[in-house]
């Protein structure tokens, strides 16, 4: 990748030198609402599930008429250990070799997929190798590349696979928050035959839900069935969330239905009763009951000491999900 010229503030006039697009970039060839998703960035970690994520993203990008960019991003093993545990320089060398093997494994996944027909496919080394200085944390590196995409495809964490140990536990929320892009999170087990035909939306009157639902509108426009699930929650900030004593839905249900209808989407809105101890479990149960093949929800959480602390529903879904999840923060 070309690196921008170094210049101090106010020292030079803005450049008008054109920047050439990469060989795999092309005008969108898809039609319909899904054409909005033109560039897909896929996270590879060297694990076998990376191949599933990459193949799925490529299949979806082909439907959208877009392209896929694959990127390997993990935290180097040696940076996670205290200096006392590293001993002499030999230990660092061995750990660096292990990191290099993980990257080679990711590249093998990419090379194998590149041999198959499908949407245009490209490899990115990320900002650390494309003009960066010091080593960036893995989530920040991927988020920096995802800024220039429509969707970032991530995987559910699998602590039983040593090839994913370099993926921080808060990787998904950190990438979603730092990039501002919606994420398609793929389960660590199973194969997705269909996606986006039967959509379940977890709705809460919040910025996170609104952002997730808005970014998922192309999915909803092409879905065969859209269901929106709501739970009665205490401390409601944006109006009444539950039906009244006569069972009449709150006004916000009509607002939501009218907004979706303005986009040509007819959705069934259901009230699931009072929220239990963990809405995440209720949500996954509802997804199974309705045979949903895509769950749309906001990603809730906040940072503390550079680590993401997730809301209960978000944490549960990311831990126990068995279907693809579309998230936005």
Question: What is each residue range found by the language model?
Answer:
Residues 154-157, 180-189, 298, 325-329:
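Short beta-strand elements of ligand-binding domains
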Residues 2-92, 178, 195-272, 292:
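Small/aliphatic-rich secondary-structure junction motif
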């Amino acid at each position: 990748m070309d690196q921008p010229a170094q210049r101090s503030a106010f020292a030079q006039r803005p450049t008008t030198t054109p920047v050439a697009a990469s060989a795999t970039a092309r005008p969108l060839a898809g039609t319909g609402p899904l054409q909005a998703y033109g560039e897909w960035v896929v996270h590879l970690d060297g694990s076998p599930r990376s191949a599933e994520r990459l193949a799925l993203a490529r299949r979806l990008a082909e439907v959208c008429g877009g392209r896929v960019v694959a990127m390997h991003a993990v935290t180097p093993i040696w940076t996670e250990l205290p200096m006392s545990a590293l001993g002499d320089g030999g230990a660092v060398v061995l750990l660096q070799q292990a990191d290099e093997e993980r990257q080679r494994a990711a590249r093998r996944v990419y090379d194998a997929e590149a041999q198959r027909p499908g949407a245009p496919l490209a490899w990115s080394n990320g900002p650390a190798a494309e003009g960066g200085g010091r080593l960036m944390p893995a989530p920040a590196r991927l988020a920096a590349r995802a800024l220039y995409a429509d969707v970032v495809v991530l995987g559910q964490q699998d602590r039983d696979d040593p090839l994913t140990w370099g993926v921080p536990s808060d990787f998904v929320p950190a990438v979603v928050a730092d990039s501002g892009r919606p994420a398609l999170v793929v389960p660590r087990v199973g194969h997705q035959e269909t996606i986006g035909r039967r959509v379940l939306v977890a709705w809460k009157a919040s910025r996170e839900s609104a952002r997730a639902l808005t970014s998922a509108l192309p999915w909803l426009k092409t879905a065969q069935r859209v269901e929106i699930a709501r739970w009665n929650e205490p401390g409601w900030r944006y109006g009444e969330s539950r039906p009244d004593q006569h069972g009449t839905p709150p006004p916000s249900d009509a607002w939501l239905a009218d907004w979706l209808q303005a986009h040509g989407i007819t959705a069934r809105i259901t009230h699931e009763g009072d929220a239990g101890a963990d809405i995440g479990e209720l949500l996954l149960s509802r997804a199974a009951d309705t045979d949903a093949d895509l769950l749309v929800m906001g990603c809730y959480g906040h940072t503390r000491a550079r680590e993401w602390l997730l809301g209960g529903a978000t944490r549960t879904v990311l831990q126990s999900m068995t279907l693809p999840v579309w998230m936005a923060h």
